[in-house]
Amino acid sequence: MPTMPGSSMRRGYIALVVVLLIAVATLAEQADTAAPAQKLPIWAYPGFPPSGTAASGPKGAEHVPGSTASYTAAQIGDLFVVPDWFPKAHPPMPEVVSHGRKPDVFACGHCHLPNGQGRPENESIAGLPTAYIVQQMADFKNGLRKSSDPGMLSVTNMVLLSKSVTDDEVKAAAGYFSSIKLKPWIRVIEVENVPRTRIAGGMLVLADGGGTEPIGDRVIEVPENLERTELRDPTSGFIAYVPKGSLEKGKLLVTTGGNGTTMQCTMCHGENLQGMGNTPSIAGRSPSQMTRQIIDFQRGARNGSLAPLMKGVVTKLTIEDIVAITGYLASQKP
């Protein structure tokens, strides 16, 4: 029988998965103990503050640099409206991305932005494989993807949305965001002391009183320009402060596995960490978001089809390891 197109590629991918499963099993056997469970880091799971402590929202008709568009505060806060400041910078949005479907399918582009760049409280989904996005929606729907923090509103919203969105809407949104290349979005800076922060709108922002404090074992990710971030400007990115020396340590863990601490990320995610097949790219994405995913795999909150691979890989990682890995990944070209 003649070989069908793509059969050799599929066999190669299956063989790779088998090899990785064996490697992960070996890694798990070598682990004396898993990394001890720790309290969830609030910098990665900031949630939403009590009423009255959120950042002050925009007032009246608003604009962002370089755009002729104008939106009101009510429009900017409406989950069924996507402030499209630069409509020529991306393909035409499917209806589910631009407006959603009332009453319970929010516009995808509102939270993830029209270009899929996302924000620390949700996820950058630009450039992810279509099949991967579709699978994640199925995992949300089937209870296989949750958050280790039940108060993580972005995940709660995704779970609720997944139960109402249609298969066609999921495919349309997945195809749209997959077609857009992720752009550099995060500036990573190594520091010993970091600006003091507060929680606003599900993310960290600079504290009103200023000042600094030791960074410790944290990644502090804040908007480059809070006002533009609140206006959902898809061209205004973020700064990620990481501890001194963490990028070199992260590179070692990512590229070599750190002498048995984990496995090389490049084995599954590609030599340049920009994905391979239906395995997602992990370069240049939010370190806050990536930290949550590693912890969620560790704690069993993520249980999709390839979760067994990731669980074995992240079992021994400490919070210091995770900070180093996610900081290094964020510093790489998407």
Predicted regions and their residues:
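N-terminal secretory signal peptides that target proteins for export/translocation
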Residues: 1-11
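Intrinsically disordered, low-complexity segments enriched in Gly and acidic/Ser/Thr residues
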Residues: 257, 264, 270-279, 286-292, ...
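Extended intrinsically disordered, low-complexity coil regions enriched in Ser, Thr, Gly, Ala
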Residues: 126-155, 186, 283-295, 299-307
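Flexible coil segments in periplasmic/lumen-exposed cytochrome c-class electron-transfer proteins
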Residues: 31-106, 145-264, 299-334
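Short cysteine/histidine-rich zinc-coordinating motifs and their immediately flanking basic loops
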Residues: 119-125, 277-283
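Detector for the c-type heme attachment site
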Residues: 110-117, 141-142, 178-179, 268-274, ...
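Bacterial N-terminal signal peptides
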Residues: 15-25
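Bacterial Sec-dependent signal peptides at the C-terminal "C-region" and cleavage site
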Residues: 24-32
